[in-house]
């Protein structure tokens, strides 16, 4: 008799728990898609890629010039005196160090700009998501990358992208 009562109590509790979870409305959102395919996100990415390519071209040209200077210096090694060679070699090392420093600073600047653009997008996206979840009685929004299998009706990505495009058509990056 004791076991029968325990069985009914456990069964009753399980049924209550499943009923409560059935009332929760859950949706999922592909954050990567939203950030990369919204108008503001695309504009920011295009700007950052263009900036990176311009810097890359400039640095490749500068690197080639440094390599040429190094080869010229090595070719003149037998002609130059030891002091002149040492002086030119030290000068070349300083140029290489400056080049590496400029390249690092350029990459850091682009990384910082990317992080700032992402942060701005997320700041604008947060109230849009809150408003949408309140209007549609959604209890929980999960990132799509954390969902193994889900009904496509629960995917709110395209709706949020449209709302984000309406609210933020472009993003300025400094």
Outline where the language-model segments fall.
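Amphipathic alpha-helical segments
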Residues: 23-147, 167-174
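Bacterial N-terminal signal peptides that target proteins for export
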Residues: 1-8
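N-terminal signal peptide c-region/cleavage motif recognized by signal peptidases
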Residues: 17-18
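Active-site microenvironments of hydrolase-like enzyme catalytic domains
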Residues: 151
């Amino acid at each position: 008799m004791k076991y029968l009562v325990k069985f009914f109590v456990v069964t009753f509790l399980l049924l209550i728990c499943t009923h409560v979870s059935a009332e929760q409305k859950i949706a999922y959102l592909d954050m990567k898609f939203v950030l990369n395919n919204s108008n503001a996100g695309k504009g920011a990415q295009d700007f950052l890629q263009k900036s990176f390519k311009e810097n890359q071209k400039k640095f490749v040209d500068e690197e080639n010039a440094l390599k040429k200077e190094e080869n010229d210096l090595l070719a003149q090694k037998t002609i130059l005196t030891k002091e002149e060679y040492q002086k030119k070699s030290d000068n070349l090392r300083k140029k290489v160090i400056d080049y590496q420093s400029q390249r690092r600073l350029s990459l850091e600047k682009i990384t910082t700009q990317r992080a700032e653009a992402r942060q701005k997008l997320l700041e604008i996206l947060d109230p849009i998501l809150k408003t949408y979840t309140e209007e549609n009685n959604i209890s929980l929004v999960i990132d799509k990358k954390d969902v193994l299998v889900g009904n496509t009706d629960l995917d709110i990505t395209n709706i949020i992208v449209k709302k984000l495009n309406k609210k933020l058509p472009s993003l300025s990056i400094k």
